[in-house]
Design a protein with these regions (language model features):
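C-terminal output helix
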Residues: 91, 109-118
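Acidic/His-rich, divalent-metal-binding segments that scaffold phosphate/diphosphate chemistry
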Residues: 124, 130-181
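Receiver (REC) domain active-site loop signature in two-component systems and cognate sites
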Residues: 58
Length: 181
């Protein structure tokens, strides 16, 4: 059974959190944080968060502080962030993007805009993770094939030229050590 994507909504307004949950519907599981500190604590405890909907202007630890913590811990690599804020200050919007947000939705917003952007961001991150897995698998497979080829060639060299196949394997090990420095 596939689990629903888990969305963390960090907003100091209970009404805004309820509105976002109502707009997004039953297709997601929700976590709620009333401030930045609670959002950070939830991200420390949970590894199953698929998306963060973040308000920038909150008392105490604000959205910018949350983004700095996420950047420091490299959580932005795993958790996309959509800022939903009433601020129209271009400097704040630019600052949010510089800190690593994926998207920015300005309040008041259209229902369809929130739905589409959330769906698109989740889909893009899922594709990115799948591609990363594929590339990683290919790199491991290529390295395995390379090691296998060197082993075969060392046996061929030993058999054909009466040279030590062990010598070829030692050269491979030394080369590998030098390349990793």
């Amino acid at each position: 059974m596939n689990e629903k994507p888990k969305i963390l909504i960090a907003d100091d307004s209970e009404i805004n959190r309820a509105l976002l949950k109502e707009i997004l519907g039953d297709g997601y599981d929700y976590l709620e944080a009333e401030d930045g500190a609670a959002a950070v604590e939830l991200m420390r405890q949970r590894t199953d968060i698929s998306l963060l909907l973040l308000d920038l202007m909150m008392p105490g630890m604000d959205g910018f502080d949350v983004l700095r913590v996420m950047k420091y811990h490299a959580w932005l690599d795993e958790i996309p962030v959509i800022v939903i804020s009433a601020t129209e200050d271009t400097a704040n919007i630019e600052r949010a993007y510089d800190l690593g947000v994926t998207d920015y939705i300005r309040r008041p917003f259209e229902r369809i805009m929130v739905l589409r952007r959330v769906k698109n961001v989740l889909m893009l991150y899922a594709k990115q993770k799948r591609l990363t897995r594929l590339v990683t698998d290919q790199v491991y497979e290529k390295e395995h094939n390379s090691v296998l080829m060197i082993s075969i060639l060392s046996h061929v060299v030993e058999f054909r030229n009466s040279e030590s196949g062990l010598h070829v394997l030692h050269i491979r090990t030394l080369t590998d050590l030098l390349l990793h420095r």
